Design a protein with these regions (language model features):
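Formylglycine-dependent sulfatase
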Residues: 3-434
Length: 434
């Protein structure tokens, strides 16, 4: 990635990662989802058309953090130890993280968001691979990889597991994890002493399932997806052509999901994409706060901001069975949780106020007591124009948008342009260290 990097300077570096977001899910890559802040960064920066991840949450994070292939970092797959080299499911001690390299070089190192490179998440378990022990000076986020956006599991500040409802340092009117991640990223910038440059890793869980969003954001997308997935996919493809993002020789890949006219639960399916869009929209809103903090402190000019996703859109069938399923066999006896209770379940049995968690086609998604994925057909839209999904090593699984913004380091003639040079996650650490 040396084509736009000036090796003489020491800029601040911010890497923002979305979770389970497809190649076409932001405006500057063809989406109808409103992402004005990312679009602004793209207009004044660079967009990569052939940037690749590893197709799955944990391997991507291991590769990003260490600048090595995931097997070299010990996480060739997920968080289970198979007994085979490269598959211990825990970040190796024989690799150094980007924070461990930048910190001795007098960079301040901050992380807000998802970690997901160790299985050791429970109280009393080893913290040797938690962020503070791997080079980050400040950390707020989740050690595990997925969970409720209204009550995320393994939420941690520094080295201490916390409940969002008993956290004296952060008490918003409504807790929503995407906001919490962006608010803490903004806090780290505001509280940075300015003596040295900083590295900030902003690792979102949005728009990974569950489909959780705030009502006002969902309302914004009401009716936007009534035409169904084929129409939305075609519109994205046409916008990509108009933007010059793809060569006209690239055609839409064959679909492997049911036609919209055969969808059994159209209203239910539409709701999923409305919520998904709201999740991406909210992520972008928070990015606007981060950019605003940089502008207020006059840091934007010499801050390299990189936005990527960990893998393509996800076709997993989370919570999509017919009917209604409860996460507890006797939902009537559930009791509210205490504010101090730690949430350690990826799929909680209940909300904080004691409402049972529900899944299935008879449950409209979006609220704290629901838990769904948006399914194969919408994931196919997310990955326009490619085929396959997260898990696969086809373009739909491993292609990610990459937006790079650095006013002081990217030449004016390159701004708003596309970079067609292929690149991979392992290039990011080397680029930052250089």
């Amino acid at each position: 990635m040396s084509s736009f990097v000036d090796g003489q300077s020491r800029p601040n570096v911010i890497i923002v990662m979305a979770d389970d977001m497809g190649w076409s899910d932001i405006g500057c890559y063809g989406s109808e989802i409103e992402t004005p802040n990312l679009d602004r960064l793209a207009k004044n920066g660079l967009r990569f058309t052939q940037f690749y991840n590893t197709g799955r949450c944990c391997p991507t994070r291991a590769s990003l953090l260490t600048g090595t292939y995931p097997h070299q970092a010990g996480i060739g797959h997920m968080m289970n130890d198979t007994g085979l080299p490269g598959y211990q499911g825990d970040l190796g001690n024989d690799v150094r993280t980007i924070a461990e390299v930048l910190k001795p070089a007098k960079y301040s190192t901050y992380l807000s968001g998802k970690w997901h490179v160790t299985p050791k998440i429970h109280p009393g378990s080893s913290q040797h691979n938690w962020p503070i022990q791997r080079g980050f000076e400040r950390f707020y986020g989740t050690i595990h990889g997925a969970g409720s956006f209204f009550d995320p599991n393994s939420l941690t500040r520094g080295n201490t597991l916390i409940s969002p409802y008993a956290d004296q340092e952060y008490q918003p009117e409504v807790f929503y994890y995407t906001d919490a991640i962006n608010d803490h990223a903004t806090r780290f910038i505001n509280e940075h002493d300015g003596k040295n440059p900083f590295f900030l890793y902003v690792a979102h869980t949005a728009p990974h399932w569950p489909m959780h969003a705030l009502p006002e954001d969902i309302e914004k997308y009401k009716g936007r997806y009534d035409a169904g997935w084929e129409v939305i996919r075609e519109a994205r493809y046409q916008k990509q052509l108009e933007l010059g993002l793809i060569d006209p020789k690239i055609k839409l890949s064959p679909r492997d999901a049911e036609p919209w006219k055969e969808a059994k639960n159209k209203e239910w399916e539409i709701r999923h994409m409305e919520v998904y869009a709201a999740m991406v929209d909210r992520l972008d809103q928070g990015l606007g706060k981060v950019i605003g903090a940089l502008e207020k402190r006059k840091m934007l000019e010499d801050t390299l901001i990189i936005f990527i996703a960990d893998n393509g859109g996800c076709a997993e069938g989370m919570g999509r069975r017919e009917g209604i399923q409860y996460q507890d066999s006797d939902p009537e006896i559930l009791r509210p949780m205490k504010a101090t209770d730690l949430q350690m379940d990826m799929i909680p049995k209940r909300t904080r106020d004691g409402v049972v968690m529900k899944q299935g086609t008879e449950v409209m998604t979006g609220a704290a007591d629901t838990y769904h994925g948006y399914g194969r057909a919408w994931a196919n839209v997310s990955n326009t124009p490619f085929r396959e999904y997260k898990h696969w090593v086809h373009e739909g699984g491993i292609s990610t948008p990459l937006v790079a913004h650095w006013p002081k380091g990217i030449a004016p003639k390159l701004r708003g342009k596309f970079e067609h040079q292929p690149a991979h996650l392992i290039d990011l650490m080397a680029t930052c260290v250089d």
